[in-house]
Amino acid sequence: MYQNFVTKHDTAIQTSRFSVTGNVIPAAPTGNIPVINGGSITAERAVVNLYANMNVSTSSDGSFIVAMKVDTSPTDPNCVISAGVNLSFAGTSYPIVGIVRFESASEQPTSIAGSEVEHYPIEMSVGSGGVCSARDCATVDIHPRTSGNNVFVGVICSSAKWTSGRVIGTIATTQVIHEYQVLQPLK
């Protein structure tokens, strides 16, 4: 009997690395959720250093996504997407993070309707003062369901109560082309 073993996140040495600075304005899950990218996330791996200002009204709820375009060339439609997140939010923002998948005809979408986003929950921990950390993976369909669309995956950050202030941290995503290893049985 053989076992399949799926590894958790391991940030690759060769990555598309860039910093995002500016303002983040979360949108309600029923509205258009902003997609944050550097305009050049087209690699199988991306590390995003996020230094942004959270511009929200008092006790605003909403979400934002940090995304990358996936490589759709593998013949197997299912691929493991690995995510590592370390973020610090100002004030009393307590976010929930997860892996998301969505399609867009655009090469670099700036927003996506909340109803068009598929959510994959991941294991995370939240500390006091709006600090969150997550490291997990999910199996995602990487082929477009609508011909001509681009497939994007990323990390969504949602909260029922955002507080205005700084967002600082790193989000790393990796598309794992070879998703599992076959282990020999124990003797």
Curated annotation (Swiss-Prot):
It is found in: Virion. The keyword Ribonucleoprotein does not apply. InterPro entries: Capsid/spike_ssDNA_virus, Spike_G, Viral_coat. Its main location: virion. The keyword Ribonucleoprotein does not apply. It holds the Pfam family Phage_G. GO terms for cellular component: viral capsid. Gene3D superfamilies: 2.60.120.20. One of its GO terms (biological process) is virion attachment to host cell. Keywords: Capsid protein, Host-virus interaction, Viral attachment to host cell, Viral genome ejection through host cell envelope, Viral penetration into host cytoplasm, Virion, Virus entry into host cell. Attaches the circulating virion to the bacterial lipopolysaccharides which serve as receptor for the virus. Determines the phage host-range. Probably triggers with protein H the injection of the phage DNA into the host cytoplasm upon conformational changes induced by the interaction with host lipopolysaccharides. The virion is composed of 60 copies each of the F, G, and J proteins, and 12 copies of the H protein. There are 12 spikes which are each composed of 5 G and one H proteins. Belongs to the microvirus G protein family. This is Major spike protein G. It comes from Escherichia phage alpha3.
